[in-house]
């Protein structure tokens, strides 16, 4: 199953809200359809959101039928619509900046067709970069996995969250392919259940041993000595190493620290936002209260109960053992070492 696939004039998006019960695709032919798919979490995961937004931007140009002189104003509208879909995942904004830069490079183009072709090529490049980068993350991350390891992960940072292979699950895949005996504990990840619905499905399809647990069982497993390592993905990493990821990640980091268990973040360098000094400056998306009052249409709480539903939390850098990127593994002091890595790249 691919999270997304370019079909030449539309974007084929796997509707992940239907998994694992049903495999259904959306054929997005306009940028508005791509924006809706991102908002509704049909496509999710920071790298996949970035790639989808890039294709959505290209579709904005493909769908434009006005004069060449009016394209710039139209594409500003397209970019704004895509940018407002999910505020926390920085890959979204990184991809849109790349697309905007490619559009500016076409200022001497005389035909719309030439510009459209260039934008599609840039979106394809972003997608291909993600495939390559995730494999490198896996290669680097394999070094921190012992010959036999029980690994805890949270949410879904696998192939379904990227164009291909995955970040946190990419490390696990690389370890298995290297002949290591890995067993994964997947937290269910309330309220949207990405761990139960997506991570468990991915790992089972790849014949990687996995056990599903409720989110509130992690501490007990650590206390029993059943967790050797925690690996999670990321939606935005601040300049000081503070990391925004799916809600519940911070709790796991605190538990891992209390039990002396290594806690790693796996993410591409496109997730690092040096313009954001610390986690306090990362915008945190708050989602629809219905996601807590209901579970897939079944009411599980009083309909009038007040709800607080942040989609992400921020793990302080001091709780992170290392950040696994395609450039290597970065360790503390993050303010220094992340900057060094980004300057070199």
UniProtKB/Swiss-Prot annotation:
GO terms for biological process: L-methionine salvage from methylthioadenosine. Its EC number is 5.3.1.23. The active site is at 235 (proton donor). The keyword Isomerase applies. Substrate binds at residues 44-46, 86, 194, 245-246. Keywords: Amino-acid biosynthesis, Isomerase, Methionine biosynthesis. Pathway: Amino-acid biosynthesis; L-methionine biosynthesis via salvage pathway; L-methionine from S-methyl-5-thio-alpha-D-ribose 1-phosphate: step 1/6. Catalyzes the interconversion of methylthioribose-1-phosphate (MTR-1-P) into methylthioribulose-1-phosphate (MTRu-1-P). Belongs to the eIF-2B alpha/beta/delta subunits family. MtnA subfamily. This is Methylthioribose-1-phosphate isomerase. It comes from Desulfitobacterium hafniense (strain Y51). The gene is mtnA.
């Amino acid at each position: 199953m691919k999270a997304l696939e370019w079909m030449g004039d539309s974007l084929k998006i796997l509707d992940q809200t239907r998994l694992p019960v049903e495999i259904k695709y959306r054929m997005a032919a306009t940028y508005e359809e791509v924006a809706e798919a991102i908002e509704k979490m049909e496509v999710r995961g920071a790298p996949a959101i970035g790639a989808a937004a890039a294709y959505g931007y290209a579709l904005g140009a493909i769908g434009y039928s006005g004069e060449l002189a009016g394209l710039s104003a139209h594409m500003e509208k397209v970019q704004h619509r895509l940018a407002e879909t999910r505020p926390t995942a920085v890959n979204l904004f990184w991809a849109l900046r790349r697309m905007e830069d490619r559009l500016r490079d076409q200022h001497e183009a005389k035909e719309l067709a030439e510009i459209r072709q260039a934008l599609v090529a840039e979106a394809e490049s972003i997608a291909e970069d993600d495939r390559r980068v995730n494999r490198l993350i896996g290669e680097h991350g394999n070094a921190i996995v012992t010959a036999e390891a029980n690994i805890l992960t949270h949410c879904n940072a696998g192939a379904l969250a990227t164009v291909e292979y995955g970040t946190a699950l990419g490390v696990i895949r690389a370890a298995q392919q290297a002949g290591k005996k890995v067993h994964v504990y997947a937290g269910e990840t309330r309220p949207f259940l990405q761990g139960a619905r997506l991570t468990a499905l991915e790992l089972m399809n790849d014949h990687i041993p996995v056990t599903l647990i409720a989110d509130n069982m992690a501490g007990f497993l650590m206390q029993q000595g059943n967790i050797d390592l925690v690996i999670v993905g990321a939606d935005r990493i601040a300049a000081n190493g503070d990391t925004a990821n799916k809600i519940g990640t911070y709790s796991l980091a605190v538990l891992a620290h209390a039990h002396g268990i290594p806690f790693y973040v796996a993410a591409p360098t496109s997730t690092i936002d040096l313009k954001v000094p610390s986690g306090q400056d990362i915008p945190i998306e708050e989602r629809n209260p219905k996601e807590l009052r209901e579970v897939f249409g079944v009411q599980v709480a009083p309909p009038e109960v007040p709800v607080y539903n942040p989609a992400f939390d921020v793990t302080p850098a001091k709780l992170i053992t290392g950040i696994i990127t395609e450039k290597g593994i970065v360790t503390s002091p993050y303010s220094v070492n992340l900057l060094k890595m980004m300057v070199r790249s």
